Amino acid sequence: NFRGDRAQEISLAFDGDESFDKFDRVKVPNVKFAGMLQYDADLQIPKNYLTEPPKIKNTLTEELCKHGIREYAISETQKYGHVTYFWNGNRSEKFDETLETYVEVPSDVVPFDQRPWMKAAEITDQLCEAIESGKYDFIRTNYPNGDMVGHTGSLQATIIGVESVDLALARVIES
């Protein structure tokens, strides 16, 4: 169940500098850390790795930018990397700053089953605004509710999370 974002987090814990603040490391272990591959070439995470990651070329965003197509991507923190970094072929930087607009809606720091609607309404507010503005030719989003709440194992919370996405999508369709 490998996830590149989790591998980046543990890599930074081992070979990040003193500014690392994701959790209290107590002390930095004196080890030579190497990941299986480099999870983020732009940010050089990790600094040492065993195999070269594949180069992903001609992503959809890259092609859209070549053709001057304006795009908009939005999600909350839990899935922001999926509509940006992973979508762009494991690339942190934008292909064209003038054509790409990325919006991260900060996730709440509470267990997902306690707030299963997450930020669906906030995402939808901004998504509908982007649609109605007419400024974008290509728009993508990721509502994380089904995935993140589903992992809690609470069926009732998951149902609420998915229903909140249903309500949000009804608003998007109206836009």
Walk through the language-model features, giving the residues of each:
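Feature captures the catalytic ectodomains and active-site-proximal regions of enzymes
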Residues: 1-175
